[in-house]
């Protein structure tokens, strides 16, 4: 029995040593808070407008804080760590299609593009939602239409995001959902991109 306990303790200890913190407490709190805000806004849409508006304003504040952190933060929080150009994203997606993409410790190029798309979409939803509460923009058809289109668009992006997370989790044998909860990922190996 002592050998079993000892082996289990060694396994747990080696797992701790082989993982590194990637996602800061801020990034994790931002991520799950935005998930909550978007879910509440979507569920309350057309039903409980005060709740819908509060969720939208909260999402807008979260986006503003993420923009600041992306420019002034550190490590994997910074945009320059994961924002790549279209050629790099296309090349990465081609590598995915051929099954030879590299594992990234932070966001891979497709994940970075998705972060930007989600931030832009939620920012647009929050902005057009706010515009509808002002005298100048209330009842303006293109503002309402844009709000609805972006609201549906964010659902598509969320589906792609979740699909990408599940795909990458399976492909690289790594639970990325757990990583966004704990902040820790498997340490980079020599063939990974740190």
Task: Please report, for each region that a protein language model flagged, where it lies by residue.
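Membrane-embedded alpha-helical bundles that constitute the cytochrome b-like, heme-associated redox core
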Residues: 1-194
């Amino acid at each position: 029995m002592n050998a079993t306990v000892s082996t289990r303790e060694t396994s747990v200890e080696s797992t701790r040593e082989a993982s590194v913190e990637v996602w800061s407490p801020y990034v994790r709190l931002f991520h799950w808070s935005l998930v909550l805000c978007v879910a509440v806004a979507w569920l309350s849409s057309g039903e409980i407008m005060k709740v819908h508006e509060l969720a939208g304003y909260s999402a807008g504040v979260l986006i503003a804080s993420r923009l600041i952190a992306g420019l002034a933060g550190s490590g994997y929080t910074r945009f320059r760590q994961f924002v790549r150009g279209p050629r790099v994203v296309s090349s990465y997606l081609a590598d995915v299609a051929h099954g030879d993409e590299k594992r990234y410790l932070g966001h891979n190029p497709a994940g970075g593009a998705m972060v930007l798309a989600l931030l832009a979409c939620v920012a647009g939803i929050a902005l057009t939602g706010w515009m509808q509460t002002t005298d100048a923009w209330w009842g303006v058809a293109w503002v309402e239409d844009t709000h609805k289109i972006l609201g549906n668009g964010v659902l598509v992006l969320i589906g792609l995001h979740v699909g990408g997370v599940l795909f990458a989790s399976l492909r690289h044998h790594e639970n990325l959902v757990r990583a966004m909860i704990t902040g820790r990922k498997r340490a980079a190996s020599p063939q990974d991109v740190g």
